[in-house]
């Protein structure tokens, strides 16, 4: 009789646990992004038909920022679950903001990989700036101090003996405003990130002074990060999320889906789809199909951020990487 009661209690407990799991609220994942199409969070929900776990174990809320530096504050305040940080703001978040529990969980894209696109820095085609030295005494633009494009720009100008404040002035503005600022001669150089760098009007009035590869070589430009307590608490949901994300990103990277990807890009940006013929080709930045970062390149990029004075010391990126979630998710797709 006692054995029967124990069996009944065990079965009841198991059923209760299963019911509780089924009735649990999906984990809310707020994801950051800056540039439309270029950042996965801006287009991931356009293929939610491939997200088998969406609405079950997790939900997604994309959140737009002007640059990666403001994301540091947001993730520190618990306003983001996943932040797509640049190599520079990764270092700032860990060293300056004290987020030692920040973990690199996946890769977004890399700049300067051989045969692929590299970020451009543009000046007026008919303007006085012919070489980097000509920027002495001029005004250059960035999206945010400490962003990836900002740090790379400073690194290039330093190669030519030019230092911020002493030799040139930096002003900040959002990427969509930069073409007008250049054409109106309010600034002398802008960082032209994709998709803005392929704007036909910008191509008409501007020319490329240098590319990021010239300044700093291969860059693990953007990585996905999350805080360890969130990952520990929600690991199962995060594996589901990364499984869906890999399925979606691989769909975008498949050349057979290129036409539909262009149509999605046109719809998201309210631009003609034919403007996005470069998307997910070698005219685009490099995207790893497994979303695994290049930690060697990333360490060099973080070290450079230290050398430019944004952080006092460079964190060891391997100690701040947890790739087990994306690796587990990838195994499900084999």
Feature names for model-found ranges:
Residues 1-9:
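Bacterial N-terminal signal peptides that target proteins for export
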Residues 8-18:
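Bacterial N-terminal signal peptides
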Residues 19-23:
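Sec/Tat signal peptide C-region and signal peptidase I cleavage site
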Residues 24-163, 169-173, 188-194, 218:
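Short, glycine-/small- and polar/acidic-enriched structural segments
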Residues 47, 55, 76, 80, ...:
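Sec-exported extracytoplasmic/periplasmic mature domains
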Residues 88, 176-267:
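Pocket-lining segment of extracytoplasmic ligand-binding domains
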Residues 232-312:
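Secondary-structure end/capping motifs
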Residues 302-334:
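Conserved C-terminal helix/tail region of periplasmic/extracytoplasmic solute-binding proteins
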């Amino acid at each position: 009789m006692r054995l029967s009661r124990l069996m009944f209690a065990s079965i009841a407990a198991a059923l209760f646990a299963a019911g509780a799991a089924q009735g649990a609220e999906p984990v809310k994942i707020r994801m950051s992004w800056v540039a439309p199409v270029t950042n996965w969070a801006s287009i991931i929900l356009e293929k939610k038909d491939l997200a088998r776990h969406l609405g079950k174990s997790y939900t997604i809320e994309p959140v737009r920022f002007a640059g990666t530096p403001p994301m540091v504050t947001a993730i520190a305040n618990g306003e983001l679950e996943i932040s797509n940080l640049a190599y520079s703001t990764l270092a700032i978040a860990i060293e300056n903001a004290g987020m030692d529990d920040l973990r690199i969980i996946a890769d977004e894209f890399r700049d300067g990989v051989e045969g692929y696109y590299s970020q451009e820095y543009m000046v007026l085609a008919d303007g006085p700036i012919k070489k980097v030295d000509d920027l002495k005494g001029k005004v250059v633009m960035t999206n945010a101090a400490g962003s990836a494009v900002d740090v790379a720009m400073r690194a290039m100008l330093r190669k030519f003996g030019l230092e911020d404040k002493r030799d040139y002035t930096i002003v900040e503005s959002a990427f969509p405003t930069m073409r007008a600022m250049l054409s109106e001669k309010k600034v002398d150089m802008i960082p032209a990130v994709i998709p803005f760098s392929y704007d036909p009007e910008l191509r008409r009035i501007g020319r490329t002074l240098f590319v990021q590869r010239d300044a700093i070589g291969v860059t693990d430009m953007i990585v996905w990060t999350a805080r360890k307590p969130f990952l520990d608490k929600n690991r199962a949901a995060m594996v589901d999320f990364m499984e869906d994300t890999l399925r979606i990103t691989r769909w975008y990277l498949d050349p057979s889906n290129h036409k539909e990807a262009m149509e999605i890009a046109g719809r998201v940006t309210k631009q003609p789809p034919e403007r996005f013929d470069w998307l997910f080709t070698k005219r685009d930045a490099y995207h790893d199909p497994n979303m695994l970062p290049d930690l060697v390149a990333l360490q060099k990029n973080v070290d450079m951020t230290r050398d430019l004075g944004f952080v006092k010391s460079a964190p060891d990126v391997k100690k701040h990487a947890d790739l087990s979630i994306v690796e587990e998710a990838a195994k499900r797709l084999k």
